[in-house]
Amino acid sequence: HNGMDVDIKMAGRVRGIDAILGGHTHDGMPVPTIVSNAGGKTIVTNAGSNGKFLGVLDFDVKDGKVAAFKYRLLPVFANILPADAEMAALIRKIRAPYEAQLGEVLARTDGTLYRRGNFNGTGDQLLLDAMMAVQDAPIAFSPGFRWGTSLLAGQDITREWLMDMTATTYSYATVTEMTGATIKTVLEDVGDNLFNPDPYYQQGGDMVRVGGLQYQCDPTAGAGQRISDMRLNGQLLEADKKYKVAGWAPVAEEAKNAGNKQIWEIVEPWLKDQKVIKPGKANEPRLVNVLPNQGLA
């Protein structure tokens, strides 16, 4: 569970691994990456997340070694394939006490709500907008989680979808006073976690999602030099000035034990009040020095 980049580096350094069926970065890779090392070659694959694909890897083994292989990424058409009866019955039994709560409609979306993006997604923007409105904060941070399902225009936003986007063991909502310098440090730390040229220093996750704040990012720059031109309402942030910042999913123990609400308790009443969500363009930084690498955007 390292992520694609870490798997590729490790495969180039470690002998004796025939294949790595990876996870963590949730990349749906239609073809494998073949990595050479001192002992031969290693196949590196990823099959996405949330049961969207099934990675199928067949080996032709001769004399105790892999002579050939065939890899396919199969889409899972969950609404077409018949469910396993025994498993479906177990799921219904476990869900039964919570079915009504999970199925409650909180709002409807007029556009696609998605999570996966290097810098933001419309689903995460929804969380940011809710935090800023409910907690009266001009800036909001939301973790760069990669998991989650999408909603299409016209679909209901249910409590189950909200939980799907937010349910962790540390989903507490926070409001913090941060200086401009601290905000830059936070963005730089997460940026280095994502863009460090050494995959072993990439700890997983996309860039922290940011609401209310505009900034410039150079993914190719060194540590501490990637983030610049941070602005709130068009005005440059001041290093020593304090700003009110909403967020969720703190890792510090004191934040976990502060008695704060869970993030879904913040977002749910906001959704009910909105009734209809009209997703606009997600707030993303202005990127520099990224062409021709379209993948960074």
Where are these regions (language model features)?
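Short, internal active-site loops enriched in acidic
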Residues: 1-5, 146-147
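Conserved beta-sheet core of the metallophosphoesterase superfamily
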Residues: 4-58, 206
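Catalytic centers of hydrolytic enzymes
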Residues: 36, 47-297
